[in-house]
């Protein structure tokens, strides 16, 4: 007796064949089953495809894979650039520009893999800029992106709103008090570092920028005593200038679960540097607190610096603990010192390259005229009248948009964020706008590759830029390099005034040129996601004849 079951096509299948059956009979049935096997395979594949059709969309509910991707081949980039090491570190900006032309100009987003942060970044078209402008940190957060990108918890602790308050409220709210200090410190450091050489004297562009910005910004952030303390200055400089290098180290490679343990070990030296700098700050805070109890810091005697402003804030006592204040101020020292250094290098290169002959004479004449109205002081009022100098700076930032050619970085904090019916991104997504591409778009800025120092001078303040492709008004974004909207760089007003004072004084005091003879403006170095100025550039300074 044989036992049968009905097969998938209605045929009987012999599960327990009777061993007494003739061998030829069993062979005949096996042959019949083999003929049915293609039908069985086709049916199985059809069922799997049908299941995949229904199940796969649930893994991509926001249709992220439908957002076009711009890929970067290491081999192809090494071939295109003609530089072998691009196989290891492929360029970033050319591919952002490729995506901008292909998608952004058609109001479509695209995505690119950011190897330094091991994340997909969604590059948004300009039409979404007004929507992002006024979003709060509970929806779209710059602060949380910075915290995640820099791995701040590995060195000095996570960022919070205090750092933003220091820039947006304390620095900006005290600009009138800050300006005289900035001017005095600038004059001191120029005399100390450059002096008044009658013959050409050589300086490295980065070393000079570090010395000048450090001397001025350290005074604003940490007070006169610490700004003139060599031990503190050394620790503060090492900490603030290493934030970005420590942020990027090892991030380019996917190390899996070993990534954070290795980063923690690498940040050990940074934590040690932070501890040294912190001791100086906490000792100063303790001294000031003691004087306050003795009523010796009243009225005009109160120091003008970020330490004192932080101590005076109406915040919980635990947030005003000396170590907490020190850590937060050292956090923002990277923004107050490192960021202006990069900007100073870029603008200084533009001054040497483009502010020549009559252009330089025109800028100098305007500065002299405006300062003369205010007894030689770089005040808010005198700087407001320097329209041509302001236009030169705006054009410089248009051509070289700071350290990163992208702006408006946000981490989506809500469960999801709906930009419109075509674009919804989930929590944890990173968005950004292609600043450099926007500012070099010929449909927005005519002749974008030409440095026109009067470009913004000719623009009326009430007019909007117009996109030549669509005829639509484009949101004003002359300073887009500093971000946009509520979460733009809170220290941008301070930074712009700082740079104008330093570089304006340099133009009045010195003739400046590239060492070794005339040359084109040094190109930027593409180090994903950074466009860095060439730190090897050498300059030469000579005091002007009319400077006494």
From Swiss-Prot:
Biological or metabolic pathway of the protein: Secondary metabolite biosynthesis; terpenoid biosynthesis
Sample GO molecular function, one term: monooxygenase activity
Membrane topology: Single-pass membrane protein
Requisite cofactors: heme
Primary location group: membrane
Biotechnology: Aspergilol A shows a weak cytotoxicity toward MCF-7, MDA-MB231, and HepG2 cancer cells lines, with an IC(50) value ranging from 21.21 to 48.76 uM; whereas aspergilol B only shows a weak cytotoxicity against MCF-7 cells, with an IC(50) value of 27.41 uM. None of the aspergilols have antifungal or antibacterial activities.
InterPro entries: Cyt_P450, Cyt_P450_E_grp-IV, Cyt_P450_sf
Compartment(s): Membrane
EC number: 1.-.-.-
Signal peptide bounds: none
Record field: transmembrane: 38-58
Keywords: Heme, Iron, Membrane, Metal-binding, Monooxygenase, Oxidoreductase, Transmembrane, Transmembrane helix
Gene Ontology CC: membrane
Residues binding heme, per UniProt: 489
GO BP terms, alphabetized: secondary metabolic process; terpenoid biosynthetic process
Protein family (similarity comment): Belongs to the cytochrome P450 family.
Record-linked PANTHER family: CYTOCHROME P450
Function: Cytochrome P450 monooxygenase; part of the gene cluster that mediates the biosynthesis of aspergiltriene A, aspergildienes A-D and aspergilols A-D. The bifunctional terpene synthase AuAS converts DMAPP and IPP into sesterterpenes. The C-terminal prenyltransferase (PT) domain of AuAS catalyzes formation of GFPP, whereas the N-terminal terpene cyclase (TC) domain catalyzes the cyclization of GFPP into 5 distinct sesterterpenes: aspergiltriene A, aspergildiene A, aspergildiene B, aspergildiene C and aspergildiene D.
Name listed for the protein in its UniProt record: Aspergilol synthase AuAP450
